[in-house]
Amino acid sequence: MIFNGLLSRFTRDMGVDLGTANTLLYVRREGIVLRESSVVAKRVDRGGVLAVGSEAKKMIGRTPGDILATRPLRDGVIVDFDTTVAMLTYFIRNGRRGRTFLRPRVVVGIPSGATEVEKRAVIDATLQAGVGEAT
């Protein structure tokens, strides 16, 4: 009990509203620290991520053939798992701001109509994004 209380001082508790259009990141005691478009721009041929969020949104419809700006969620559920992981990784790293050495605990909002498989995909993507615990 004491150990958990001590650890909570060195980790960050976060909430993620993973939306089709926008993603919000809330950090306990700080409020909303990130509000970004849920868009990722990546290279089609090599798969590397070029931009995430607002920067990627600016690229929609303006990219050469080897770059694709896409929304990895549709109707609140994941349609591109790997791209969602890349997006969450970027957002969570920005929310951590390098002040902690422990991975954050994260609560993720999931649409009430999501199936069990869709819910599991959101939790798995969040865990793969480098958090310590996701619910």
Model regions: which residues?
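Nucleotide/phosphate-binding catalytic cleft detector across ATP-hydrolyzing
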Residues: M1-T135
